[in-house]
């Protein structure tokens, strides 16, 4: 807030900083904003100015067998990879948070390494691993590797939630005769649920938008929506790609709003525990 006691230099800095932040934000979102109007263009090319308003390219998207197959594949792969990432990521986060053993930092670095290793390296390594097994072009390999990419997000969000977890609740449940499984299901899991769901949403978004690994591991029958968009850009540049991109943008916005809601809920739960 602008203070009435600011000097002229402080006022210039105040407004300059906000203008700079606005320009950076515009630079980041402008490519996204550019693609949306093109999806409603009545013309057959991805060019400005727009020739008119039309929903033809959305109709083409939903009427195309190739686009629908790629969408179906994404709906198969992303939820399956998310479930795997959520289960293994949550268990790993609990073990790494509560455990105290030699090499703990090294193990943590290894399990979150897919976040920092270039995806193309993961794609090549995955292909060299699965291809000799005859699983190079299969949903199995695609789901497993997508889950590996999503696990670090779950570990980080769940670990952050566990930092404010009151372990006296677990001890109290155990003292009342609850088994470890019952304690986890009825005490631990409800309290760390915002972190688990947040990580799962990140894992889902990562899998749903991933294209590099998919290029290495997916055949024509396993092509996901991002790969179909990539192929369309190379082979047949059509505004249908803009329609697909707009749908992905809308989906991403919904995910971000959901994550923000979960973050607020997590803060309330943490405050209530204190």
Whereabouts are the PLM-identified features?
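Hydrophobic alpha-helical transmembrane segments of multipass integral membrane proteins
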Residues: 26, 68, 72, 76-88, ...
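Loop-to-helix entry region at the N-terminal start of transmembrane alpha-helices
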Residues: 69-76, 128-153, 157, 193-195, ...
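Interhelical loop and adjacent transmembrane-helix boundary motif
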Residues: 6-13, 43, 58-66, 208-258, ...
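Transmembrane alpha-helices
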Residues: 19-20, 25-32, 123, 148, ...
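Membrane-interfacial helix termini and adjacent extracytoplasmic/periplasmic loops
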Residues: 3-7, 46, 50, 55, ...
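Short membrane-interfacial helix/loop motifs at transmembrane-helix boundaries
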Residues: 30-65, 215-220, 274
């Amino acid at each position: 807030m602008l203070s009435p006691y600011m000097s002229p230099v402080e006022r210039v800095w105040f407004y300059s900083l906000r203008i700079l932040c606005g320009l950076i934000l515009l630079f980041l979102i402008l490519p996204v904003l550019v693609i949306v109007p093109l999806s409603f263009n009545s013309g057959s090319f991805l060019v400005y100015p727009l020739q008119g308003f039309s929903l033809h390219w959305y109709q083409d998207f939903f009427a195309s067998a190739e686009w629908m197959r790629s969408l179906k594949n994404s709906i198969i792969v992303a939820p399956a990879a998310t479930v795997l990432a959520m289960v293994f990521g949550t268990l790993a986060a609990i073990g790494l948070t509560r455990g105290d053993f030699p090499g703990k930092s090294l193990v943590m670095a290894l399990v979150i390494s897919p976040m920092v290793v270039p995806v193309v390296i993961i794609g090549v390594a995955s292909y060299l691993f699965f291809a000799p097994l005859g699983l190079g072009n299969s949903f199995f390999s695609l789901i497993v590797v997508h889950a590996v990419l999503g696990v670090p997000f779950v570990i980080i969000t769940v670990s952050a939630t566990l930092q404010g977890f009151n372990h006296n609740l677990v001890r109290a449940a155990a003292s009342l005769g609850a088994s470890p499984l019952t304690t986890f299901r009825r005490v631990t899991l409800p309290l760390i649920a915002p972190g688990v769901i947040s990580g799962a949403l990140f894992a889902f978004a990562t899998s749903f938008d991933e294209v590099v690994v998919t290029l290495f591991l997916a055949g024509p029958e396993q092509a996901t929506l991002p790969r179909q968009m990539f192929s369309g850009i190379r082979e047949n540049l059509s505004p249908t790609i803009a329609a697909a991109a707009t749908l992905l943008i809308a989906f991403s916005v919904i995910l971000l709003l959901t994550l923000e809601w979960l973050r607020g809920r997590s803060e309330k739960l943490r405050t209530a525990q204190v």
